[in-house]
Amino acid sequence: MENIDICVEWEGPFSLEDIGYDENSNKYSISKELPLNDDKKDYGIYQVYGYHPVYGNNVLLYIGKADDQTFAKRLSQEGWAYNEDYKNIQIYVGRLFGREQKISGDEWSKQIGLAERMLIFAHAPAKNSSNILNITKDKTLLKEFENIRVFNYDAYRSLMPELSGELWVKGFNEYNGVYSTDNMIEKK
């Protein structure tokens, strides 16, 4: 099977106010003028950083995707304003790019989904726990990752710059256990 290279250019940070949150009304007002609401380009993957009661301040909380709606629309639906330290929430958005000038909508959406799942699998953000369990239990999904590489550029924050299914999935499938004296070959 052919390798699939997914390149992601990250931008941020953005605040909840940047995507239309109004603290006084406790509501979002999504308009075309907002950053991250351009219906031609504001699709891809996003990271949310903020406070977590166990892990502390300014940590990776969540990785999500926006492929059917813009980043601003998608993020406004997730309830980040209810985080007890919502004023310090930071959002980073990743847009896919590649060698091909044009890509089909289906392929774009597929690559967004693959990259999102691979990033969740490798980084295990606290608020993605149900997605992590679904991915690790589904051998078909894990097999799908084997030939994928994700390259992160620019403001990728605490994500690894490069991920590969070769490292995260294929290697573990070939793993035969920890070395011990029980399975040691005798010295000559």
Residue map of PLM features:
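Boundary/linker segments flanking structured domains
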Residues: M1-L61, D67-K188
